[in-house]
A protein has these predicted regions:
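N-terminal acidic, glycine/proline-rich low-complexity segments
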Residues: 1-213
Length: 213
């Protein structure tokens, strides 16, 4: 008779701030769900934007990213209390004050912790750029992981880059932040079709059905 199965304990290795455009493509909420369920990381904040590229279709309503992110937290980890500040709906060059989301990033970076801080961004770099402009020493206290940028090595148009190109230019050219970039040619290797999403999510219990819809 086999012994009962046991879960192998997983220690927290990093603090993570998850930044994305949760009111845009559905991949943002799927990525957030994945991050919240990853036992080796501690999600300390969830920051969002509601921006669209020039000449594109209208984007999310201000507050919609914040609302969607909070709902995912309630579904998956209701006992946790990551900071979920207001969406940033103003492009980097038009900001007249530091966004709430950027302030949350700076506040978390100031905390004393044995866990290194990673900021994972799957949308525009607006919040990160504004935080780095406010306090350039932030670059020494966090590592940025960004899904964005054109095909390597030639570059070119890419959605997350186009959402706020000046923000990306500031982060790459005006800061000393350590950046792990996953450009178009890399993240397209992880593409899912609508049919696959329907099969995996809609049959994955109440939360999966909610996420798909």
């Amino acid at each position: 008779m086999s012994a009962p199965s046991r879960r192998i304990p997983v220690a927290k290795l990093t603090r993570v701030i998850v930044d994305n455009d949760y009111a845009g493509d559905p991949d943002g909420l799927v990525a957030l769900a994945h991050q919240l369920l990853t036992e080796s990381t501690e999600v300390v904040a969830i920051t969002g934007t509601t921006l669209t590229p020039p000449h594109d279709m209208p984007g999310g309503v201000p507050g919609s990213a914040q609302s969607a992110a909070r709902e995912v937290v309630q579904w998956l980890t209701p006992a946790t209390e990551p900071a979920v500040p207001a969406d940033t709906s103003t492009p980097f060059l038009e900001l007249t004050s530091i966004p709430d989301a950027s302030r949350v990033i700076l506040d978390e970076a100031e905390k004393s912790s044995d866990l290194p801080l990673f900021v994972t961004c799957g949308g525009p770099l607006t919040n990160i750029a504004a935080a780095l402009r406010e306090d350039p020493t932030l670059a020494e206290r966090m590592t940025l992981c960004w899904i964005g940028g054109g095909a390597y090595p030639e570059g070119g148009w890419e959605y997350n880059l186009a959402l706020d190109t000046p923000a990306a230019q500031f982060v790459f050219n005006e800061s000393s932040a350590e950046i792990h970039q996953f450009p178009l040619t890399t993240y397209r290797q992880c593409a899912y079709s609508i049919a696959e999403l329907e099969f995996v999510l809609s049959g994955g219990g109440p939360f999966g059905a909610w996420l798909y819809e």
